[in-house]
Amino acid sequence: APEGLKARQGKISDEEYANLELVEAPRKASPARGFSFAAEKFNSPNFNKTVYLGRTVTAPNEAGAPAYSYVFFPKGVYNKWHMHGEGQILIATDGIGLHQMKNGEIQVMRPGDVAFCPPGETHWHGAAPNSSFGHIAVSPLGKHTVEWYDFKDIKEYKKNKVKK
């Protein structure tokens, strides 16, 4: 714990967890050569509220690696139905997320889970209604063409609270 503060011990309540205030530690490194670290507020009409986006690896790059972006969805935030022309890979890193392919079942994503969205397949993803969610989005082939559609029905979305 920082000087002058006592470390918290024991389990925290659900209410305490829901009201945690996160503070980003100052960065010692700076982005260089197309690599970035910190996620910044990102507002888009394709998300129902603000998300946080970090361009971790941009493409094209010297290594020939695909583009990697870190996206953090606060509790209850999700995106519109959309389709990636080149496909997309999602790697869950934080919290609990939801992912659904058109005409498919909703899949729960927890840290370490991976979802593959084939080229041309419509899907949506985001935080569960009762949890925040973070993922790394990988855009194969160094391209990233996206077609956006409508939002999933909010009443349907809210039915998907997930046990933590």
What are these regions (language model features)?
Residues 52-55, 67-84, 119:
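Conserved short histidine dyad/triad with adjacent acidic residue
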Residues 103-120:
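Short acidic-glycine-tyrosine-enriched beta hairpin
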Residues 130-150:
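A short hydrophobic beta-strand segment most commonly corresponding to one strand
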Residues 1-65, 146-164:
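A short, N-terminal "cap"/entry segment at the start of jelly-roll beta-barrel domains
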Residues 70-74, 83-99, 138-141:
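Short, conserved beta-strand element in jelly-roll/cupin
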Residues 79-81, 99-100, 122-128:
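Short beta-strand His + acidic residue motifs that chelate non-heme Fe in jelly-roll/DSBH
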